């Protein structure tokens, strides 16, 4: 199992295929995605890599977190995410990951926070049909109706579908197809829509329900110092040498 990446949602557009058909895609951008920390079994009990993306001002980062980045000798990041990986997929701290980490035709899972819609009624939030237009119904045509039973249990059950805040929930869309990538501009084009608004941070992983393509870079597509893609160089997790 290899690491995923952190990307920022740019927006939607369309790409034309060779036969003239157009495909609606979401544009995702990798902004200076680097390995900030590595977790190992001896010290942490599990193996993982912590990635950082974007950039942050020092005044917006707490002193302990600034020390965390200073230890890794990387710039301050706006977003930190930890990815569990196999022992042979551990990357060195400071490694930069390219958009070629995923390949065209590959299926990925994308997680993010959905767009917030504010306070919404039961018809918009849950698709309820509402009450009748006439026959005794007054001022309650779009209400959700009864919410409970009788004296027993004498309460409204938890998770009852009612009016409330709609959206702004962490959600994952599975098996989205990667149409193409642009390593020079660090862009990934994914078929269809993904959770989140423009500018939102998203987490992209290999699909869990479909096998990873055999020609996908393993353990990662790494940027060389000159900005070009370099072959991946896995390192053993601390305490796993020998």
Curated annotation (Swiss-Prot):
TM helices/strands, residue ranges: none
Location of N5-methylglutamine modifications: 151
Post-translational modification, as annotated: Methylated by PrmB.
Superkingdom field: Bacteria
GO MF: rRNA binding; structural constituent of ribosome
One GO process term, biological-process aspect: translation
Complex and partners: Part of the 50S ribosomal subunit. Forms a cluster with proteins L14 and L19.
Name of the protein in its database record: Large ribosomal subunit protein uL3
Protein's organism: Zymomonas mobilis subsp. mobilis (strain ATCC 31821 / ZM4 / CP4)
